[in-house]
Amino acid sequence: MDNDFILVLDLGGPQAVEMARKLRNQRYYTEIMSRGADEELFRRKAPRGILVVGGDGYSEPFPKAALALGVPVLALGGAARRMIETCGAVSEGILLKEQASQITFKPCPLFDQLSESDRYFARVDGFALPEGFVSIATTLEGFSPAYADLERRLYGLQFYAESNDPDGAVILSNFAEKICGCTPIWTAKDFLEEEVRYIRERVGNGSALMAVSGGVDSTTCALLMHRAIGERVTCVFVDTGLLRSGEAEQVRNTFEGELGLKLISVDAGDRMLNRLRGVIEPTEKRQVIYEEYMKILAEVGREHPEAEYFVEGTIYSDLLARGSSDAVYARRFDPGKRLEPIRMLFKDEVRILGELLGLPRALAARQSFPGPGLAVRCMGEVTESKLALLRRADAIFREEIQLAGQDKKLTRYFAILDDTRTVGRRLGVTTREYACVLRAVGEQGLASYTVGKLPYDMLERAAARIIREVPGINRVTYDISPCENTFVEWQ
């Protein structure tokens, strides 16, 4: 992409990912950088412009390295307040808080094609503007939620481009193209052609092993590698014993049958359960599973010394989550021999790429599944008997969701086995069995979720079937915890 891109500087919160994805959806390439980056890193990246977002609870000064580069800067939300203060503004206190107002845009490149709009403001502060800055918008109350130094191309808006916000999309597009000079050329098809060329140049006549789980990310990456180097990529599927009902067999059938890819399948269920014996804490579960998984991949690597490269289906959200850590690779391989072909793609872009590569539509729409599998949906110690209960309950819930036609409205839906035993009755006999929790969420915007509003009669059917068909579970609840206060997963 050379330097034809916007760098999104994340000061904290979910907005950075959402803004980056909005720009990508308009075909402008973006990369995200976390706060704390020094000026030298900014210069090496050499973006056309910088979008700074987040920081509503961020008390540190605005990153001066973003201002020192001399490229256009657009700061949104709390970042806009930090920027104007760093440039010498004096705060006059909070003028608006958590309310909607009409905003009138003044003529400037950022607001081209816009005149006025109704917006929600989490907070608007008043400022005595420093030299060079002018107000570029006013609210109905006469307050200024936006300002700019037009000569230095510094813009601050005390609001965000919201979900389903056409005016916000125009503002982002104006910044990228009319102010920064970026070209809207980012498409999955162009990425595919460019990445195939890169993989062929990098691997040459060599061969590779690729870790796959059967999910959208790793399957798409496997198809990409196969497009680039054909039979010289061999997929490695580790059946950890922590997958959903019938999933391991489905993965093997899909890769070897439907997709025609070379596959090594490793049955590691007993081995993984032995390592998990006595482990209760979620963090420790994840660590144990990760360590054992990587040991298995390293063993497979040693059994196939002809494979010079190790490939992972890492996507951009994985990259952002792990930060500067560079430890996610099989130990048999030199880090320089690791490939992560789709590491700069968001999940929705991976699905689009997958369809271009011939990924079956049903698999492209497959819901996300946590890396540690059912271990993080099984509260307390993970045992074979508890996993069996969870698989059966989960399969029933998923079946009822699909029968009710709710699957197209939801992003994720699954069962959780609580470690609590409750009093119940089965065939007239008092029981003390496990409680099961059902969870369903839909996507709201690009980086947030909302609780699934499922039909009550459907929930009743699912609960009745689980209690009737799964001895060992005598209570079913539905988790309606709001997603702004809780994670989608329980662990």
Per-segment meaning from a language model:
Residues 75, 79, 84:
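Gly/Ala-rich beta-loop-alpha elbow adjacent to hydrolase catalytic centers
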Residues 1-52, 56-62, 67-69, 85-308, ...:
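RNA-binding accessory domains that recognize and position tRNA/RNA substrates
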Residues 322-323:
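Short, solvent-exposed loop/turn and secondary-structure capping segments
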Residues 312-314:
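Extended catalytic-interface subdomain
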Residues 316-318, 444:
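Short loop/turn segments at secondary-structure transitions that flank enzyme active sites
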